[in-house]
């Protein structure tokens, strides 16, 4: 106690439904040690963001029964997250998924969702993400998915001979918005982009 002031810590009343949903996500991805540790160490009770050096985390809102406000996974280390049911996280406002192996994602029940970042997820495309019917005016969604075209060299690279036609017509527009493509020429010896 300093100067007549004492710190107070109020026990959180975290939503048991949200905790059960987080546990179910971990159970559905048994090969992911980050999710397993997140649950077994009860790290889900701590607010932590994606910039805090962790691969999995949540923040809770300040309602009397706290709901998960944000949830993130960066699965770049193991790439073992293959399924994700976030439908029970009804208070979710921000979702950040990176480097997973998800093939689809249903966000349709998340009516409070304000932003979603989906970077480097194996085959998750804008076609395979189901959004809520009614989105907030300033909804923010960003990210990228690498689509292999040509002959694969490894899990991240492919090549195509000059003049090879690559059909991307299926990805020309998403929800009426034209897609943007970036092409790179990589020096295979150095791995550096030349064009």
Roles of regions detected by a PLM:
Residues 77-82, 100-104, 122-125:
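Canonical position 11/12 of the leucine-rich repeat
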Residues 84-85, 105-109, 127-128:
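The leucine-rich repeat
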Residues 91-93, 101-104, 109-112:
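Tandem repeat domain/solenoid detector
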Residues 115:
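An anion/pyrophosphate-binding glycine-rich loop and adjacent beta-alpha core
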Residues 1-90, 94, 129-195:
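N-terminal capping/linker segments that flank leucine-rich repeat
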């Amino acid at each position: 106690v300093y100067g007549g002031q004492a710190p107070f810590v109020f026990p959180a009343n975290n939503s048991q439904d949200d905790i059960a949903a987080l546990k179910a996500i971990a159970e559905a991805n048994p090969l992911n040690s980050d999710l397993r540790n997140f649950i077994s160490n009860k790290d889900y009770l701590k607010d932590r963001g994606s910039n805090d050096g962790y691969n999995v985390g949540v923040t809770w809102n300040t309602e009397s029964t706290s709901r998960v406000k944000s949830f993130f996974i960066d699965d770049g280390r193991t790439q073992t997250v293959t399924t994700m049911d976030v439908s029970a996280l009804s208070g979710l406002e921000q979702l950040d998924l990176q480097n997973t192996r998800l093939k689809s994602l249903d966000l349709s029940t998340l009516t409070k969702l304000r932003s979603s970042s989906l970077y480097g997820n194996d085959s998750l495309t804008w076609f395979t993400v189901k959004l809520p019917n009614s989105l907030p005016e300033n909804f923010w969604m960003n990210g990228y998915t690498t689509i292999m075209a040509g002959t694969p060299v490894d899990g991240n690279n492919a090549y195509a001979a000059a003049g090879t036609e690559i059909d991307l017509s299926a990805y020309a527009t998403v929800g009426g918005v034209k897609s943007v493509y970036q092409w790179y020429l990589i020096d295979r010896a150095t791995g550096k982009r030349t064009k």
